[in-house]
Amino acid sequence: MDWITFTKKFLLNYYQMKKLFLPLGILLVNYAYCQQNARQPQTTPVSSYETYQPPIFTDPQRLAKIKAAIPVVEKLYRDYAEKNHFPGMAFGLVVDNQVIYSGGYGYTDLANKTKASGKSLFRIASMSKSVTTMAILKLRDEGKLRLDDPAYLYIPELKAMPLLTKDAPAITIRNLMTHAAGFPEDNPWGDRQLDGKDEELINLIKSGISNSNVPGVQYEYSNLGFAMLGKIIGNVTGIPYQQYINENIFKPLGMDHTLWEYSKVPADLLAHGYRWEEGQWKEEALLHDGTYGAMGGILTSVEDFGKYMAFHLSAWPAKNDPEAGPIKRSSVREMQLPWVFNNLNAKFKYPNGRECALVSSYGYGLRTSRDCQERVFTGHTGGLPGFGSQWWVMPEYGIGVIANGNLTYAGMNTVNFAVMDTLISLAGLKPRELPVSPILKLRKDELVKLLPDWNNAAKSAVFAVNFFPDRSIELRKKASQALFAKIGKIRNITELKPLNQLRGNFQIEGENGSIDVYFTLTPENPGLVQQLDLKEVIK
């Protein structure tokens, strides 16, 4: 066969094959398209914020019940102050966006018998720390620094400071905010440094700091680290950290009576600090404002600091409302996250003796604790020679408490835990309830129609691609029919209880028992059922 004859036959065969397979190819493409189209969700994809509904409190009498419990709350504080021999104490209760109650016990000035009240200005010590980190986050949000930047970019003297080992990473701003810079615990020493000067801090850095660990591996409380954060704020903004915080945090929140320098506080509002020694009260000398004030120098009242607490509460839950605070709500929530593990107290007991394990972590200038009932507390203690203070907020319950005392290292944690626990019990408080998202409700309704026989389930556009490969439709049908037969005639299907936007459970109640139906959706838009668990409810 010559080359020309071969070429003619090849082309003839090619065109014949093309005529044969082209229609078949088109048919296969159309079939694949139809199959793909058939399994696509019938719900039109939407932006999440268009359908999102935030969790809400459902008890219309919630605030009234809280107010009715105030006499019990006040008695708890007064009894605690008397039992622990406090010269004076101020305390308050924050609900949602306001201080609904404040009170006092004893005196802020023993010599002049000045009574303590919600307006008295106490030095709140380390309760100041979260204010400093809030300022750092504001600068971060404005693009003026980054949390994982080496701190030496903002305090150049840190560049040459030796760390514990040669392989130690540079100290970051985040390390300073979470007590993970490798500095030693320094409470007794740091508490006497409030009036220190910038040059003293820089000289300390230049002379070398004794490290207890390498950065980023372990929590260890450091006042020195927060003094550095104050210095970073000053270096980045070009103004003292006190001025920056006054203008950008206190003023927007209306905290007009919160100060840094005790000599500027009106005499009738200033709480004097005391220690009980040798059978008598001895006044502690107040330190002037200085470089270390960023870790513990603020003077404020229950009523003023309550506005700051209310702002923390306002960040929850996430919502579509316009921003209205000094920093973004998402940044406030970020502050409260458990960034560094602190401890687990498996035998923690509430003051009433009820045992309930408690895990504690540190966020950005905040301590966050979660108890055995999944209740979350966020706040901070404060202690100095002459003072002790503490605040908690419970974002999911929308409540907060604060207590300030003028006794050296007065412990307020115990009484605040007691108040929160008692208040929840007396008022019957419940956390916010999450409304059912539209897609979750739709998938529930679809599941109810398909169970227990699974008719046409594979073509229903309800299930994700993993669902039937994970467990065949035959096995699912057999198991569900057995469960339905066991519970008998269906009498009721309960409301869906959402765990979040894309997972939840409900129950199918029959004459002889009930089935719990738990399901989760995929990250696709709209979400498809990727997991379904049917379990008999054992009563």
Task: Please annotate each region the language model reported.
Residues 379-380, 390-393, 397-406, 516-518, ...:
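Short, well-ordered beta-strand elements
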Residues 1-39:
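Bacterial Sec-dependent N-terminal signal peptides
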Residues 109, 163-383:
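Short, surface-exposed loop or secondary-structure junction motifs
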Residues 33-68:
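Sec-dependent signal peptide cleavage junction
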Residues 357, 478-522, 529-531:
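Surface-exposed, charged secondary-structure patches
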Residues 347, 375, 403-475, 539:
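Short, gly/Ser/Thr-rich active-site loops of penicillin-recognizing serine hydrolases
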Residues 80-92, 111-175, 212-224, 293-296:
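Short active-site loop at a secondary-structure junction
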Residues 58, 62-122, 144-146, 157-160, ...:
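Short, conserved catalytic-motif segment at the N-terminal edge
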